Protein backbone atom coordinates (compact mmCIF):
# COMPACT_ATOMS: atom_id res chain seq x y z
CA UNK A 1 0.00 0.00 0.00
CA UNK A 2 1.47 3.37 -1.05
CA UNK A 3 2.00 6.08 1.54
CA UNK A 4 0.44 9.52 1.05
CA UNK A 5 0.75 12.89 2.78
CA UNK A 6 -1.85 15.64 3.11
CA UNK A 7 -0.63 19.09 4.10
CA UNK A 8 -2.81 21.46 6.18
CA UNK A 9 -5.63 19.04 6.94
CA UNK A 10 -7.31 18.35 10.27
CA UNK A 11 -7.62 14.57 10.22
CA UNK A 12 -6.11 11.52 8.51
CA UNK A 13 -7.93 9.98 5.55
CA UNK A 14 -6.93 6.38 6.14
CA UNK A 15 -4.21 3.97 7.15
CA UNK A 16 -1.97 4.88 4.22
CA UNK A 17 -2.25 8.64 4.85
CA UNK A 18 -0.21 10.98 7.03
CA UNK A 19 -1.32 14.53 7.80
CA UNK A 20 0.64 17.63 8.78
CA UNK A 21 -0.88 20.85 10.13
CA UNK A 22 0.12 23.92 12.12
CA UNK A 23 -2.67 23.18 14.60
CA UNK A 24 -2.70 20.15 16.87
CA UNK A 25 -5.30 17.48 16.07
CA UNK A 26 -5.56 13.80 16.92
CA UNK A 27 -3.50 11.74 14.49
CA UNK A 28 -1.99 14.84 12.88
CA UNK A 29 1.70 15.78 12.92
CA UNK A 30 2.16 19.37 14.08
CA UNK A 31 4.43 21.08 11.61
CA UNK A 32 5.04 24.28 9.66
CA UNK A 33 5.22 23.84 5.89
CA UNK A 34 7.27 27.03 5.65
CA UNK A 35 9.89 25.66 8.04
CA UNK A 36 11.82 23.50 5.61
CA UNK A 37 12.90 20.82 5.15
CA UNK A 38 9.63 19.04 5.85
CA UNK A 39 9.97 16.47 8.67
CA UNK A 40 10.01 13.48 6.33
CA UNK A 41 12.61 11.28 4.68
CA UNK A 42 13.69 11.44 1.07
CA UNK A 43 11.53 9.33 -1.27
CA UNK A 44 8.97 8.62 1.48
CA UNK A 45 5.60 9.24 -0.24
CA UNK A 46 3.78 8.06 -3.33
CA UNK A 47 1.69 11.23 -3.29
CA UNK A 48 1.42 14.62 -1.57
CA UNK A 49 -1.89 16.49 -1.54
CA UNK A 50 -2.94 19.97 -0.48
CA UNK A 51 -6.19 21.85 -0.96
CA UNK A 52 -6.50 25.63 -0.62
CA UNK A 53 -3.19 25.76 1.19
CA UNK A 54 -0.59 27.10 -1.25
CA UNK A 55 -2.26 30.55 -1.42
CA UNK A 56 -1.45 30.98 2.28
CA UNK A 57 2.25 31.11 1.38
CA UNK A 58 4.18 33.88 -0.30
CA UNK A 59 5.33 32.93 -3.79
CA UNK A 60 8.93 32.20 -2.78
CA UNK A 61 7.65 30.03 0.08
CA UNK A 62 5.44 28.13 -2.35
CA UNK A 63 8.38 27.50 -4.68
CA UNK A 64 10.50 26.23 -1.80
CA UNK A 65 7.64 24.04 -0.60
CA UNK A 66 7.28 22.36 -3.99
CA UNK A 67 11.05 21.84 -4.15
CA UNK A 68 10.98 20.00 -0.83
CA UNK A 69 7.92 17.97 -1.85
CA UNK A 70 9.98 16.77 -4.81
CA UNK A 71 12.53 15.52 -2.29
CA UNK A 72 10.05 13.51 -0.19
CA UNK A 73 8.23 11.98 -3.17
CA UNK A 74 9.27 8.59 -4.45
CA UNK A 75 10.34 8.50 -8.10
CA UNK A 76 7.10 8.42 -10.07
CA UNK A 77 5.24 9.97 -7.12
CA UNK A 78 2.68 12.73 -7.69
CA UNK A 79 1.94 16.05 -6.04
CA UNK A 80 -1.65 17.30 -6.33
CA UNK A 81 -2.44 20.91 -5.48
CA UNK A 82 -5.86 22.59 -5.40
CA UNK A 83 -6.03 26.38 -5.07
CA UNK A 84 -8.11 29.47 -5.99
CA UNK A 85 -6.49 30.65 -9.24
CA UNK A 86 -5.75 34.21 -10.28
CA UNK A 87 -7.95 33.70 -13.34
CA UNK A 88 -11.06 33.45 -11.17
CA UNK A 89 -10.26 36.84 -9.63
CA UNK A 90 -9.95 38.25 -13.14
CA UNK A 91 -13.42 36.94 -13.99
CA UNK A 92 -14.93 38.62 -10.94
CA UNK A 93 -13.39 42.04 -11.66
CA UNK A 94 -13.76 41.93 -15.46
CA UNK A 95 -17.27 43.36 -15.62
CA UNK A 96 -18.27 40.60 -18.03
CA UNK A 97 -21.59 38.88 -17.44
CA UNK A 98 -21.24 35.98 -15.03
CA UNK A 99 -22.60 32.51 -15.66
CA UNK A 100 -25.45 31.40 -13.38
CA UNK A 101 -23.00 29.25 -11.41
CA UNK A 102 -20.57 32.14 -11.02
CA UNK A 103 -23.38 34.42 -9.88
CA UNK A 104 -24.41 31.77 -7.35
CA UNK A 105 -20.83 31.75 -6.08
CA UNK A 106 -20.85 35.54 -5.65
CA UNK A 107 -24.09 35.49 -3.66
CA UNK A 108 -22.91 32.67 -1.40
CA UNK A 109 -19.39 34.01 -0.87
CA UNK A 110 -20.59 37.56 -0.29
CA UNK A 111 -23.29 36.63 2.24
CA UNK A 112 -21.11 34.25 4.24
CA UNK A 113 -17.48 35.23 3.80
CA UNK A 114 -17.74 38.98 3.18
CA UNK A 115 -20.69 39.97 5.39
CA UNK A 116 -20.32 37.38 8.14
CA UNK A 117 -16.59 36.55 8.17
CA UNK A 118 -15.38 39.93 6.85
CA UNK A 119 -12.77 38.46 4.51
CA UNK A 120 -12.54 41.65 2.45
CA UNK A 121 -10.21 44.39 3.76
CA UNK A 122 -11.93 47.28 5.60
CA UNK A 123 -13.04 50.30 3.61
CA UNK A 124 -14.38 48.45 0.56
CA UNK A 125 -18.09 48.21 1.35
CA UNK A 126 -18.82 50.76 -1.41
CA UNK A 127 -17.56 48.31 -4.03
CA UNK A 128 -19.75 45.84 -5.90
CA UNK A 129 -20.38 42.37 -4.52
CA UNK A 130 -18.13 40.94 -7.22
CA UNK A 131 -15.26 43.25 -6.34
CA UNK A 132 -15.62 42.56 -2.63
CA UNK A 133 -15.59 38.81 -3.30
CA UNK A 134 -12.42 39.22 -5.37
CA UNK A 135 -10.79 41.17 -2.54
CA UNK A 136 -11.92 38.54 -0.05
CA UNK A 137 -10.30 35.77 -2.08
CA UNK A 138 -7.12 37.80 -2.49
CA UNK A 139 -6.74 38.69 1.17
CA UNK A 140 -8.94 36.50 3.44
CA UNK A 141 -8.22 38.62 6.52
CA UNK A 142 -4.55 38.73 5.59
CA UNK A 143 -4.26 34.94 5.43
CA UNK A 144 -3.88 34.73 1.64
CA UNK A 145 -0.48 35.86 0.41
CA UNK A 146 -0.31 34.85 -3.27
CA UNK A 147 -2.80 33.52 -5.80
CA UNK A 148 -1.09 31.58 -8.58
CA UNK A 149 -2.24 31.62 -12.17
CA UNK A 150 -2.74 28.22 -13.79
CA UNK A 151 0.01 28.60 -16.39
CA UNK A 152 2.32 30.15 -13.81
CA UNK A 153 1.81 27.18 -11.51
CA UNK A 154 2.46 24.66 -14.27
CA UNK A 155 5.58 26.45 -15.52
CA UNK A 156 6.96 26.72 -11.98
CA UNK A 157 6.52 23.01 -11.32
CA UNK A 158 8.27 22.19 -14.58
CA UNK A 159 11.14 24.55 -13.74
CA UNK A 160 11.55 22.86 -10.35
CA UNK A 161 11.94 19.49 -12.06
CA UNK A 162 8.50 17.89 -12.16
CA UNK A 163 7.26 16.15 -15.28
CA UNK A 164 3.82 15.23 -16.62
CA UNK A 165 2.39 18.49 -15.26
CA UNK A 166 -1.35 18.55 -15.98
CA UNK A 167 -4.48 20.44 -15.03
CA UNK A 168 -7.43 18.30 -13.96
CA UNK A 169 -11.12 18.95 -13.41
CA UNK A 170 -12.13 19.16 -9.76
CA UNK A 171 -12.39 15.69 -8.15
CA UNK A 172 -10.71 14.01 -11.13
CA UNK A 173 -7.18 12.64 -11.08
CA UNK A 174 -4.63 10.44 -12.77
CA UNK A 175 -4.00 8.80 -9.38
CA UNK A 176 -6.69 6.48 -7.94
CA UNK A 177 -6.05 7.67 -4.36
CA UNK A 178 -6.62 11.27 -5.42
CA UNK A 179 -9.96 10.74 -7.19
CA UNK A 180 -12.92 12.40 -5.42
CA UNK A 181 -10.58 13.61 -2.68
CA UNK A 182 -11.38 17.33 -2.97
CA UNK A 183 -13.90 19.00 -0.66
CA UNK A 184 -17.39 18.31 -2.07
CA UNK A 185 -19.60 21.13 -3.29
CA UNK A 186 -20.11 23.32 -6.34
CA UNK A 187 -19.04 26.51 -4.57
CA UNK A 188 -15.63 25.05 -3.76
CA UNK A 189 -15.24 23.63 -7.25
CA UNK A 190 -16.10 26.93 -8.93
CA UNK A 191 -13.11 28.76 -7.47
CA UNK A 192 -10.60 25.92 -7.55
CA UNK A 193 -7.89 24.94 -10.01
CA UNK A 194 -6.24 21.51 -9.83
CA UNK A 195 -2.77 20.53 -10.98
CA UNK A 196 -0.85 17.28 -10.70
CA UNK A 197 2.86 16.80 -11.37
CA UNK A 198 5.16 13.78 -11.24
CA UNK A 199 8.63 13.29 -9.82
CA UNK A 200 10.81 11.82 -12.58
CA UNK A 201 12.06 8.25 -12.33
Describe the function of each predicted region.
Residues 61-68, 74, 78-201:
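S-adenosyl-L-methionine-dependent methyltransferase catalytic module, highlighting the catalytic core
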Residues 2-89, 195-199:
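Conserved SAM-binding loop
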